[in-house]
């Protein structure tokens, strides 16, 4: 069997069957739900009807039993179910209610079981499954599998259903690849933005407020301010106008936009006033507001393109189990922009957005991958316009020599799109920037411009984000930098540590004020702790880029002894020179 990503998924899928077999041997009361392969491994959902909760000790026993099963060189055999109703009845009789439910749904799809057999042909285990699987367990190396953790998972992801126990695991072709992945997980755990969020006092999510609603603490809001300043400056340089729109709007607006038909379950509604029949909605998107601003004036081909941007906060309902730190929230700020242009301007506008994305991600030292999603089976708008739009997106990327993948049929019903997946320091990809064409909203709101021949035409509309969600992007940045923000973003850029408060505090105070007046984010650490403790805490624990130590020699020479995060001592420089160096780093966004 050729070893590639596709066959690795097959191997992992087979491992999920082996895990289910091991669990049912050790825990006969366990009932099976689903167990697919994933990009990073596999999982299986179990219902332990006696209420037992899997422990770390249980995972070790299950993993050992899996290795015993693998050693037996068992085969996987596909079996077409001849009598589906009989099989459903058997599942129910065995208490396998989840398998019975799945089979009932797929009974007209030629459903199959996969049988796990020993060398004598005895069936040791079976599972409802479409496959495929590896031929036998000899393809799996016992030292290349690892059970990772247990988590709760609602049956079918529905909070109204029973909570099951999901065992996450992974498997590789060999132990070296497994060890590399486990090392990666260790590093990812150290960088977890939820952990660093507490350690560095960056943000919190409080039960009293609600899940997925973020409190930005001063440290992280300082980072956000710097990024928003960059955002505003760059947008103005690139010809955008910046707007602000309300947090709520009448439901009628969302009926016109189509959100009430397609997005209602994700929207927050405000209770109707007793004196009015008007229903208000907390905005899930900024687009309709920008269209209304467009409508406020007459437009001709000469006034286009109109590039309109907003740091607009939106709210979208999420299931509580899906919420996670900053990366999956219910209230977030989008760096949203909508561009209204003529068809002839489309390719140039796309190119300018791609430049914007590339320039921005370069600042954060992030690469990116690109995907083009094309027309789905169900779509709105004219087929010719779709073909022109897709051709325009391809042309813009092809002219730049950009590599991109095509997701056929994966575009939104209202237009094709380009997605940019940024790569962080660990090589993980995150969905951030998007360019989305929209044939739906311009028609729904009947927006027009006057063309050269005097006729009224519908403009091309582009939705565009660079960061996506500000909350999500900051979560990504925390992990990308492992909390050690570069100087221009660091909440505190310099810590000043006097060796002796009695002898050196006055000069340290002077240096502190001079740096503060220069616009540097600086703190004076005049606590009674030891000098080494304060240096270590600043550089390692609080991840401050620079520490300036002040003693007798520094006072004599009007200088500071500089320690740099990740480097250590870098020498003594004059106060003015140090300030100039920091100012340059900040200006260069280093």
Question: Which residues does each PLM region occupy?
Answer:
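NTP/phosphate- and nucleic-acid-binding module
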Residues: 1-31, 39, 45-590
């Amino acid at each position: 069997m050729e070893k590639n990503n596709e066959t690795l998924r097959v191997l992992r899928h087979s491992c999920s069957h082996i895990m289910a077999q091991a669990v049912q041997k050790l825990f006969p009361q366990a009932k099976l739900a689903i167990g697919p392969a994933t990009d990073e491994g596999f999982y299986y959902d179990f219902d332990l009807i006696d209420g037992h909760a899997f422990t770390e000790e249980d995972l070790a026993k299950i993993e050992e039993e899996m290795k015993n099963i693998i050693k037996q060189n068992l085969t996987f055999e596909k079996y077409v179910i001849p009598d589906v109703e009989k099989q459903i009845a058997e599942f129910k009789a065995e208490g396998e209610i989840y398998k019975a439910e799945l089979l009932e749904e797929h009974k007209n799809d030629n459903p199959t079981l996969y049988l796990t057999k020993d060398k004598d042909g005895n069936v040791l285990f079976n599972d409802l499954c479409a496959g495929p699987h590896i031929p036998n367990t000899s393809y799996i190396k016992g030292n290349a599998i690892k059970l990772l953790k247990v988590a709760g998972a609602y049956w079918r992801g529905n909070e109204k259903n029973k909570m099951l126990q999901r065992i996450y695991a992974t498997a590789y072709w060999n132990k070296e690849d497994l060890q590399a992945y486990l090392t990666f997980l260790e590093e990812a755990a150290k960088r977890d933005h939820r952990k660093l969020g507490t350690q560095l006092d960056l943000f919190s999510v409080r039960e009293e407020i609600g899940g997925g609603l973020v409190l930005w603490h001063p440290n992280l809001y300082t980072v956000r301010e710097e990024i928003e300043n960059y955002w505003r400056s760059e947008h103005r340089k690139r010809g955008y106008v910046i707007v602000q729109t309300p947090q709520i709007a009448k439901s009628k607006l969302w009926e016109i936009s189509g959100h009430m038909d397609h997005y209602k379950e994700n929207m927050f509604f405000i209770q109707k006033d007793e004196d009015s029949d008007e229903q208000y909605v907390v905005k899930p998107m900024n687009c309709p507001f920008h269209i209304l601003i467009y409508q406020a004036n007459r437009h001709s081909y000469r006034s286009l393109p109109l590039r309109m941007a907003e740091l607009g906060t939106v709210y979208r309902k999420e299931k509580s189990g899906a919420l996670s730190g900053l990366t999956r929230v219910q209230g977030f700020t989008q760096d949203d922009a909508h561009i209204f242009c003529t068809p002839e301007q489309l390719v140039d506008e796309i190119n300018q957005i791609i430049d914007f994305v590339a320039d921005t991600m370069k600042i954060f030292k992030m690469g990116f991958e690109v995907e083009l999603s094309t027309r789905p089976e169900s779509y709105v708008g004219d087929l010719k316009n779709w073909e022109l739009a897709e051709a325009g997106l391809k042309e813009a990327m092809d002219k730049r020599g950009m590599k991109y993948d095509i997701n056929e049929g994966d575009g939104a019903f209202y237009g094709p799109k380009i997605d940019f997946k940024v790569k962080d320091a660990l090589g993980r990809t995150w969905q951030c920037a998007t360019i989305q064409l929209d044939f739906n909203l311009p028609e729904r709101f009947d927006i027009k411009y006057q063309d050269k021949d005097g006729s009224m035409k519908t403009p091309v509309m582009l939705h565009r984000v660079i960061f996506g969600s500000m909350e999500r992007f900051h979560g990504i940045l925390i992990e990308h930098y492992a909390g050690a923000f570069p100087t221009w973003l660091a909440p505190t850029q310099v810590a000043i540590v006097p060796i002796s408060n009695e002898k050196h505090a006055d000069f340290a105070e002077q240096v502190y004020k001079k740096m503060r007046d220069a616009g540097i984010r600086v703190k004076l650490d005049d606590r009674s702790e030891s000098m080494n403790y304060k240096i270590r805490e600043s550089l390692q624990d609080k991840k401050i880029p620079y520490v300036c130590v002040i003693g007798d020699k520094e006072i004599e020479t009007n200088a500071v002894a500089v320690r740099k995060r990740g480097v250590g001592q870098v020498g003594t420089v004059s106060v003015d020179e140090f300030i100039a160096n920091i100012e340059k780093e900040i200006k260069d966004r280093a």
